[in-house]
Amino acid sequence: MDVFAFFNLNELAFGLSKLPMFPYFDMAHYIISVMSLREQPGALCVSQRSPLACWFSSMLYCFGGAVLSALMLADAPVAPLSNTTNLLLATLMWYLVFYCPLDVVYSLASLLPLRLVLTAMKEVTRTWKVLSGVSQAGSKYSDALFVMVAVGWAKGAGGGLISNFEQLVRGVWKPETNELLKMSYPTKVTLLGAVVFSLQQCRYLPIQTHHLTFIYTLFTVTNKTRMMLLGSSSHPLSSLESFLYKTLFVRPLTDLSAEHTHSKHNGSVPEPTTAQTHTKEAEASKKTN
């Protein structure tokens, strides 16, 4: 893009696209994921009652996206756990966050400056996960836009999308927390990334991959940092989401509502239903008796 050449950002964007995630960025992802689990209601009790269930829930938080995307592509769901090094690293982070003496690791990671850095690094890994999912789907189903979006979304936000299953591991059942019913910010921003990367891979967006990677990473990191510093849940997607909802999905008044309004204006009283008639007759018979 000419903008990148004008501001001499080509080398920075290309360098970011070649940045290795292991071990430091993966470690940040594991720490923040396990901390998110620990901060769930009742998670500490589960860690004392059943360390195995706590470990399994932590691995779902860390590798849920890879597991879900593997299922969608008819691959073995345990394939993401075949990397012993990553699995051991995630297990080490789980142990330190939950069982480190004096809670040293969790207390240090909870400090705002360090948590900002770790969260920013986790957002960088989100970009790579989304792009990896889109590319993986594109290699099997070329130009299948919907499949690429779905797999990229699953790989980037799978931990949230399978949260109901993860809750069952901890003995919790809250179907109202389904991410599809009420999506959290990470799920929304991951869906946005899956859409734009899929459009780029299908050549609907005239932009190079490393340029789009730089733009999306910059957007997610700066926005997440702003939200943490301000302690606010508002994000730039709220306005777009509200506009699309009001434009496409708000239903007009139903016929029943229209009839009710018309009767109210005319001063007419709607006829009682059969159940109401039976109730009144029963009350009248009681009074008579």
UniProtKB/Swiss-Prot annotation:
Coiled-coil parts of chain: none
Keywords linked to the UniProt accession: Endoplasmic reticulum, Ion channel, Ion transport, Membrane, Potassium, Potassium channel, Potassium transport, Transmembrane, Transmembrane helix, Transport
Record: residues binding a 1,2-diacyl-sn-glycero-3-phospho-(1D-myo-inositol-4,5-bisphosphate): K122, R126
UniProt main location, coarse: endoplasmic reticulum
Stretch list, region Disordered: 260-289
Catalytic activity: K(+)(in) = K(+)(out)
Stretches assigned to the Lumenal side: 1-18, 74-85, 126-144, 202-210
Gene Ontology BP annotations: fin regeneration; regulation of bone development; regulation of bone mineralization; regulation of release of sequestered calcium ion into cytosol
GO terms under cellular component: endoplasmic reticulum; endoplasmic reticulum membrane
The protein's role, per its UniProt record: Intracellular monovalent cation channel required for maintenance of rapid intracellular calcium release. Acts as a potassium counter-ion channel that functions in synchronization with calcium release from intracellular stores. Activated by increased cytosolic Ca(2+) levels.
Subunit description: Homotrimer; conformation seems to be controled by binding to diacylglycerol (DAG).
Protein name: Trimeric intracellular cation channel type B
Gene source species: Danio rerio
Gene: tmem38b
